[in-house]
């Protein structure tokens, strides 16, 4: 577990170096703790793995002031666990469900228990996110998603994809994108 925590800490540090997350930005995590442990997604969730991943993100939140969203599994239609204040700030309508390990996933249910005032929302448009175990967070990212590459592309046995977003470049040949 110590190796997992160290890998995760390094991954988050490298991600922040590139994504440059700022206060009040929205971050989404999709995570299969089963995949991290080497099993097929949805088959053997782990509270211990969820705790390790959550603690790293809690540190990132403290350093940056970002808002965290934890994607549930497909049994809850990939709804997201957020703090009630996050839902209010981003004007996100809530939905009625409480994630549990077998319907929501180990990661989302762990996050729900750790938060001060957790709620579920159906969808968000996050500024950045990390997908651990191919949980498909793309539906919750703003357009345009930009891949972020870090020194490792796996956590435990799970494949990891990292992304930040950028504003759309609009206009034509005469458009200017940087101030002179």
UniProtKB/Swiss-Prot annotation:
Pfam families: DUF436 (PF04260). This is UPF0340 protein YwlG. SUPFAM superfamilies: TTHA0583/YokD-like. Belongs to the UPF0340 family. Induction: Negatively regulated by TnrA under nitrogen-limited conditions. It comes from Bacillus subtilis (strain 168). The gene is ywlG. HAMAP family: UPF0340 (MF_00800).
